[in-house]
Amino acid sequence: MDSQGPIILEKSIKIEEVIKIAITSIIDIVTKTVTPEIKAPYELVDVEYDKMGSDYILSILVDKEGGITVEDTSDLTNIISPLLDTIDPDPFPNQYMLEVSSPGLERPLKTADSLKAAVGSYINVSLYQAIDKVKVFQGDLLAFDGETLTIDYLDKTRHKIVNIPYQAVAKVRMAVKL
């Protein structure tokens, strides 16, 4: 503060944006720390850090061929928990609960490799901006060449094909066909 009063930023930053940046930073740090230690047959699927009620939850989603067992999650927790304690400086502003689990049926597809492996699967795609007035597509992933997702989806009762540029994708996950 100077003699003229408080300094006012030209652009106002919403508290939600600051929190989102902090969470992204925590996720990046945790991902870089645990990735080298999660070895075959396991695959790191995702890292999430969320507030649920008054608690913070750090979720490490791991999978393997044939699925994850309770014993697997226990073994991985015993590897991951001490690793997180070694991060310096501590990125966590609050105490958190560590949850190591399977990604479940609607697992996120975070990488180009995971999308290539999902060709032929039923997926849910959220976009940054709408294509033909649609921002969320759910359908069969027909192809992914690294740049474009080709999806067969239902528009009311008609099958349609849409090509979605990979850079337009905000989020992709597996979906359950009902």
UniProtKB/Swiss-Prot annotation:
SUPFAM superfamilies reported in the protein's UniProt record: YhbC-like, C-terminal domain, YhbC-like, N-terminal domain
Presence of keyword Cytoplasm: yes
GO biological process, one term: translation
Keywords associated with the record: Cytoplasm, Ribosome biogenesis
Main location: cytoplasm
CC annotations in GO: cytosol
Keyword Cytoplasm among UniProt keywords: yes
Location of this chain's protein in the cell: Cytoplasm
InterPro entries, per the entry: Ribosome_maturation_RimP, RimP_C, RimP_C_sf, RimP_N, RimP_N_sf
Listed Pfam families: DUF150_C, RimP_N
Family membership noted in the UniProt record: Belongs to the RimP family.
Purpose: Required for maturation of 30S ribosomal subunits.
NCBIfam families given in the database record: PRK00092.1-2 (NF000928)
Protein name: Ribosome maturation factor RimP
